Amino acid sequence: MSNIIKQIEDEQLKQDLPTFAPGDTVVVQVKVKEGDRERLQAFEGVVIAKRNRGLHSAFTVRKISNGEGVERAFQTHSPVVDSITVKRRGLVRRAKLYYLRERSGKSARIKEKLVRKSS
């Protein structure tokens, strides 16, 4: 029975997702339905948490909008999430960055991870 469930879940997984981790700045394109039309809305912020559970994977993105912190949780393989783009890689030493909730301004900055190019 569990093999059938696993097979159905594997069919619904998105294959075109980029690899991202907590600390990365991402742009999530979300499908928003307004009346009878549908449009894409961008949500850009720092990934503060990631949960890897196959089809039930999720991640939380935090941004500052008009001086107010806004967090939004997304299901990774949801049809509502159109695309995920990584803008910046962050250098952090934690899996969950909940401490950023209490910080603002310069203390909430995250160092950028520099990727070495192999020659």
UniProtKB/Swiss-Prot annotation:
It comes from the Bacteria. This protein is located at the 30S-50S ribosomal subunit interface and may play a role in the structure and function of the aminoacyl-tRNA binding site. It comes from Photobacterium profundum (strain SS9). InterPro entries: Ribosomal_bL19, Ribosomal_bL19_CS, Ribosomal_bL19_sf, Translation_prot_SH3-like_sf. One of its GO terms (cellular component) is cytosolic large ribosomal subunit. The keyword Ribonucleoprotein applies. Belongs to the bacterial ribosomal protein bL19 family. SUPFAM superfamilies: Translation proteins SH3-like domain. GO terms for biological process: translation. Keywords: Ribonucleoprotein, Ribosomal protein. This is Large ribosomal subunit protein bL19. PROSITE patterns: RIBOSOMAL_L19. GO terms for molecular function: structural constituent of ribosome.
